[in-house]
Amino acid sequence: MSRYRGPRFKKIRRLGALPGLTSKRPRSGSDPKNQLRSGKRSQYRIRLEEKQKLRFHYGLTERQLLKYVHIAGKAKGSTGQVLLQLLEMRLDNILFRLGMASTIPGARQLVNHRHILVNGRIVDIPSYRCKPRDIITTKDKQRSKALIQNYIASSPHEELPNHLTIDPFQYKGLVNQIIDSKWIGLKINELLVVEY
């Protein structure tokens, strides 16, 4: 299955707020179809919705998500927690968390168009796994800096997770450590995703 490119608002109405997909919020009580659907939810539906939340928030394909679940299963510790840590340490997600992009698809585009350097080298793979002490900067070109400057200026200044630091004047971010589970911005039960 390929990456989802359809209407984002439909997914938000169905699954709830997905800050990585879009910053828009649905109005409460505005969708009459949703009110008709509010029957008893089966266990399968609950697990499926949790998995879809994760997929659409991080912009993953089904195959990519399965690969991450497989890697998390082999690692030490809780599979669900390790899965979320793996997803949070992706380069596109870290750019989103730093405020250098308004959404994760926007961050993915910045990386694909070669505007981002990690430790002084161009990285054009959005799924690149960042490690502690990685320095994320933009290219020295004026166009790259202008893009990042627009994103930083237009984004609401939310509290930065403690595993990241940003210098907005030098367009530079630093990964301090692996993310702590309380800083994950998505309300999700990761165990249901692993069970699915």
Curated annotation (Swiss-Prot):
| Alphabetized PROSITE patterns for the sequence | RIBOSOMAL_S4, S4
Query: What Gene3D superfamilies is this protein classified in?
Result: Ribosomal Protein S4 Delta 41, Chain A, domain 1, RNA-binding S4 domain
- Its main subcellular localisation, reduced to a broad class, is plastid
Q: Which GO cellular component does the record give, naming just one?
A: small ribosomal subunit
Q: Where is this region: Disordered?
A: 15-42
Q: Where in the cell is it found?
A: Plastid, Chloroplast
UniProt keyword terms in alphabetical order: Chloroplast, Plastid, Ribonucleoprotein, Ribosomal protein, RNA-binding, rRNA-binding
Q: Which InterPro entries would you find in this protein's record? A: Ribosomal_uS4, Ribosomal_uS4_bac-type, Ribosomal_uS4_CS, Ribosomal_uS4_N, S4_RNA-bd, S4_RNA-bd_sf
Record keywords: RNA-binding included?
A: yes
The molecular function GO annotations come to:
rRNA binding; structural constituent of ribosome
Q: Which GO terms describe its biological process?
A: ribosomal small subunit biogenesis; translation
- S4 RNA-binding domain residues are 89-150
The family note in this entry says: Belongs to the universal ribosomal protein uS4 family.
Q: What is known about what this protein does? A: One of the primary rRNA binding proteins, it binds directly to 16S rRNA where it nucleates assembly of the body of the 30S subunit.
The record describes its quaternary structure and partners as: Part of the 30S ribosomal subunit. Contacts protein S5. The interaction surface between S4 and S5 is involved in control of translational fidelity.
- The name of this protein is Small ribosomal subunit protein uS4c
Q: Which organism is it from?
A: Iris pallida (Sweet iris)
Q: Upper lineage ranks? A: Eukaryota, Viridiplantae, Streptophyta, Embryophyta, Tracheophyta
Protein encoded by which gene: rps4
